[in-house]
C-alpha cells in the first residue's frame, strides 16, 4: 500500500498498487472529480508533484503533450508505484452524496424514437437515492455486465429515476432492454457517480452542448435550474444526425415558456428541407459565440464530440475551469456486452 497526499486539501489516503489512484481515492471517501472512468473524458486529471505512477499500456490519448510536460496524470487509469504527492481540487458538492446499491422496479418503457428508450425505474419506498442533476449510475442485471447511464430527471422527492438508453447494435444489454425487458421487472442500480453536475454558486450564462442521448443529463440539469427558479441564461445546442434523432420536444417547449432558455438543434446529416443549423454542434456554438469569456460550458455526448468541443471552446477564451463534461464511452464493456 502506498500513501497518496493531496497538496490542496492536506489530506491523504492509502492506495494499493493494483488499483487506480482514483479508485483508491473514492474508496476512502475522497470527492475527486471524475467522469467516464475509462480514460476518455479527462475529468480526473491531476498534477503529480512527486512520486511514480504507471499505466497498463500506453499513456491515455486524452493527455496532451502539454499535459505530460506539466506532470498531469489521469487518475482513473494510473496506478501508484510509490508514495504520491498530488494536486487536485476536491468537490465539496459531492461530500453529502453517498454511492448506494439498491434494487429497483421497471415502471415504464417508452420508445422515444427508433433507437432511444426512456426507461423509468422505481426505487423501493423504504430507500432513497440522493444525487446531483447530471450524475450517472450503473445499471445492473444478473445476466449481463453493468453499464453506465446518466440520470435524465432532476432530483425531486419522487422515487422515480429516468434513463435515456440508445440501442447499441451488438449490445447484449441494450438489446435485452429494447426487446425483452418488461414492466415490473427487477434491476439493480449503483450510484450516483460522476462529477458532471451544475455549479449552482455561479451566475455565469450556460452553454449546454449535447450529442445524441447526451441530452439526458443536460435535461436533468435544465429541469433543476427551472425547479430552483434560476434566471441564468441558458443556451442548449443539441447535435444529432437527422431530425428524427431529436427524440424530445422538451427543448422547444422550454424555449417557448422561459425567456432565459434558448434551443439550437444542429443536424450533421440534414436533408434539403432542414433550415436550421447544420454540421458539427460545437462549430455552431463558436459561430454564435466567438468570445466565451464569462461563460460556463457543459458538454455531454460521444468522446470525439466532447473533446472537439473542449478544444474549440478553450481556443475562444473559455476559462478551462468553466468547461465541464461527461463522455458517453462504451468501452467500459465490450460491444458484445453493452
What positions do the PLM features span?
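Iron-sulfur (Fe-S) cluster-binding segments and ferredoxin-like electron-carrier domains
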Residues: 20, 24-33, 43-92
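N-terminal pre-ligand scaffold of iron-sulfur
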Residues: 1-32
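FNR/FR-type flavoprotein reductase catalytic core
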Residues: 166-338
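Ferredoxin-reductase
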Residues: 98-186, 204, 240-242, 266-270
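Short, charged beta-turn/beta-strand-edge "cap" motif at the junction between a beta-strand
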Residues: 92, 143-145, 191-196
Amino acid at each position: 500500500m502506498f500513501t497518496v497526499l493531496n497538496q490542496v486539501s492536506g489530506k491523504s489516503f492509502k492506495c494499493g498498487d493494483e488499483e487506480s489512484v482514483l479508485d483508491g481515492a473514492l474508496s476512502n471517501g475522497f470527492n475527486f472529480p471524475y467522469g467516464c472512468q475509462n480514460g476518455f473524458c479527462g475529468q480526473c486529471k491531476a498534477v503529480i508533484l512527486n512520486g511514480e505512477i504507471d499505466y497498463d499500456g500506453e499513456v491515455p490519448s486524452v493527455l496532451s503533450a502539454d499535459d505530460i510536460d506539466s506532470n498531469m496524470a489521469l487518475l482513473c487509469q494510473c496506478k501508484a508505484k510509490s508514495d504520491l504527492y498530488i494536486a487536485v481540487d476536491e468537490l465539496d458538492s459531492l461530500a453529502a452524496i453517498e454511492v448506494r446499491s439498491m434494487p429497483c422496479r421497471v415502471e415504464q418503457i417508452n420508445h422515444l424514437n427508433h433507437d432511444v428508450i426512456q426507461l423509468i425505474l422505481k426505487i423501493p419506498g423504504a430507500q432513497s437515492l440522493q444525487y446531483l442533476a447530471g450524475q450517472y449510475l450503473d445499471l445492473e442485471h444478473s445476466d449481463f455486465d453493468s453499464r453506465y447511464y446518466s440520470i435524465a430527471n432532476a432530483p425531486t422527492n419522487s422515487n422515480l429515476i429516468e434513463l435515456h438508453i440508445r440501442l447499441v447494435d451488438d449490445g447484449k444489454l441494450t438489446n435485452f432492454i429494447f426487446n425483452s425487458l418488461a414492466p415490473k421487472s427487477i434491476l439493480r442500480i449503483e450510484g450516483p457517480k460522476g462529477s458532471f453536475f451544475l455549479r449552482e454558486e455561479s451566475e455565469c450564462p450556460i452553454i449546454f452542448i449535447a450529442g445524441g442521448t447526451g441530452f439526458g443529463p443536460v435535461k436533468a440539469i435544465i429541469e433543476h435550474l427551472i425547479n430552483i427558479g434560476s434566471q441564468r441564461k441558458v443556451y442548449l445546442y443539441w447535435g444529432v444526425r437527422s431530425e428524427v434523432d431529436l427524440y424530445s420536444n422538451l427543448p422547444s417547449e422550454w424555449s417557448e415558456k422561459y425567456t432565459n432558455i434558448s434551443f439550437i438543434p444542429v443536424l450533421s446529416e440534414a436533408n434539403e428541407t432542414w433550415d436550421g443549423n447544420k454540421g458539427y454542434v460545437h462549430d455552431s456554438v463558436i459561430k454564435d459565440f466567438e468570445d466565451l469569456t464569462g461563460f460556463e460550458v457543459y458538454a455531454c455526448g460521444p468522446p470525439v464530440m466532447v473533446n472537439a468541443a473542449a478544444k474549440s471552446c478553450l481556443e475562444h477564451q473559455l476559462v478551462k475551469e468553466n468547461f465541464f463534461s461527461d463522455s458517453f464511452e462504451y468501452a467500459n464493456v465490450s460491444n458484445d456486452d453493452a
